[in-house]
Amino acid sequence: MVARASFHTWLSPLDGSEVVTVPVTLPSDVPAVVASARKAFESWSVTTLESRGRIIRTVAQILESRSEELAKIVRQETGKPLGASLGEIGGAVEMGYLVSSQGRHEMGSLLPSAIPGRQVRVQRMPLGVAALIVTYNAPFPNYAWKAFPALMAGNAAILKPSPATPLSAMVFGEILQEAGVPEGVFQVVHGSGETAAALIDAGVELVSFTGSYPTGQKVVEASARNLAKTVIELGGANPLIVCDDANLSAAVDAVIDSAFSNAGQRCSSASRVIVQDGVYDAFVARLMTAAESMTWGTEPDVLVSTLVDSQSVEAFESYLAQAQSVGATVDRVGALKGAPAPEACLAQPAIIQGLAIDSESGMAEFFGPATRLFRFSRDEDAIRMANTSEFGLTAAVWSSDIARAERIVEQLEAGVININGPTHGAEINMPFGGVKHSGNGSRDAGIHSIDQYSDIKVVSTFFGA
């Protein structure tokens, strides 16, 4: 039994009410958690793929049957609109069905050999104990993207959720147990960054992390001390390019969705909108009209709801003040709906103009309901501006000339790019991740997600020996 000496209480960003109080796993307790996971790994790793898949499929079925209840938990915990919360549960369900089907798929291959009588087999094998360290902005999808392939590959897994999403993580763990995941194979530990650091230092074989670049850099450095495999998905300052032949109305809708849904708390939000000179004024006029009518507040059906906590509101407002201090114009937009509680962690949406794209304020990553507008003249200028950022997670290009859009896409430094779409919207069968400071070459989700959570074993058989 792991001793826990303190507790963590989370308050809803909607109204300041208590969501849940959970026990905190202290750094000194982490080695015992890892040891129990390692013990459980011994039997779980030799369970058949089909059996593991059947359990994960059951998890998906339970998530699906309880989707409305779970969506209300997400809304209470993070402040998200109810529809968005339901959509996230659906994404977790689909990830479960995708990964569970891998139990009936080929998990290796045969290679030809130059030596007569030799057969070479390449197969996947589990790594051991996986530490899953996730952020708050999409709790159930984050858990599903990491836990399902980690478990399907035969690993034991320890989830360290954000302090902002303790209830959803606790319920997710309970559902896995209900579905038949053996004791110790999947555990949830609550705590601060010190708890996460202790997990890495305890010698886990894999660390899967979603969060900011500065923290991700520390995670990779700490993991390297034990040569632990890392799956890293970090931040973004994602560009959405609008060419002069784009459908402006549709492009405006894409910007509203990409920049302001989830209150801009996506690593894939469109925080830089790069518009061609010839249509800039017309585009901005349409965008302002659309932005003025988008709803914000704490009602369940608004587009822009709360940020996750008051510190996030302060950081967002501080960024806007910094942008104004260097000459930017900040227009506050949106239609407030209802009468939010004084404790609500709300920030009015904003549209920013007048920044240099290569300035600190022009390139910075921020979490909040805002976007920055920039102008370009030639396509090569748009490409250069888009690639100015140190990040390279997602991007979007809007043009009615698909060949032109494809030429731009070929030169963009990003891991996920949409033509005539938003900067977000990855599907579960698509690998998701970035380049430059947005990742390290690993990918979450996708049909090959199990590869990220396993290693390769090569076996040769010599016949006739």
PLM region spans:
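Short, well-ordered beta-strand elements within core beta-sheets of diverse protein domains
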Residues: V19-T25, A40-V46, L132, L240-C243, ...
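Structural signal for hydrophobic packing residues in well-ordered secondary-structure cores
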Residues: F41, S45, A60-S67, A71, ...
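Rossmann-like NAD(P) dinucleotide-binding subdomain of oxidoreductase/dehydrogenase enzymes
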Residues: S109-A250, F376
